[in-house]
């Protein structure tokens, strides 16, 4: 939510927010090319947590057909966005990465799958930062920065409308 206010005695015409933008990108466009570092892949507990339909009902939802999203809170602090994908050959050789069963709704039923959290770069991409934006902090802080940031295209549209207004 953005609030913009002006003094009535200085700016008499009403401010008009920018029109809604049509979303034109698929979520996969924000992902890094495979492979991503193994540290982003989940073990058994994490995989079961993100694929359990009963637990999914309690999560916050933002376009749930695309990606599962969890909000940070003081009790749990499990934070981030997750992806379930088909395993690559090297995943079978890494004991830390859990390979579970998941139905991708592609007609194949339950098949091998791995879960992973999005990388900080992917989270920044999702917020509209391009790849020239340098992430100079550790992953934990980068996730928080991405979560607390303003979506870049929205900010650009607001600034453009404000410069036209003023």
Regions found by a protein language model. Give the residues of each.
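Short, flexible coil/turn micro-motifs enriched in small/turn-prone residues
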Residues: 63, 142-144
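FAD-binding beta-loop-beta segment adjacent to the flavin cofactor pocket
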Residues: 95-106, 110-137, 142
């Amino acid at each position: 939510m953005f609030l913009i206010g002006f003094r009535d005695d200085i700016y008499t015409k009403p401010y008009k927010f920018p029109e809604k933008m049509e979303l034109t990108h698929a979520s996969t466009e924000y992902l890094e090319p495979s492979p991503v570092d193994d540290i982003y892949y989940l073990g058994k507990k994490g995989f079961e947590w993100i694929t359990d339909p009963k637990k999914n009902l309690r999560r916050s939802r933002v376009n749930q057909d695309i990606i599962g999203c969890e909000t940070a809170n003081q009790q749990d602090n499990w934070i981030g966005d997750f992806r379930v994908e088909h395993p690559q050959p090297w995943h079978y050789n890494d004991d830390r990465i859990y390979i579970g069963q998941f139905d991708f709704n592609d007609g194949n039923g339950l098949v091998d799958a791995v879960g992973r959290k999005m990388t900080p770069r992917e989270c920044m991409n999702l917020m509209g930062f391009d790849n020239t934006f340098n992430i100079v902090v550790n992953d934990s802080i980068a996730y928080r920065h991405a979560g607390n940031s303003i979506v870049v295209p929205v900010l650009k549209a607001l600034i453009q409308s404000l410069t036209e207004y003023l």
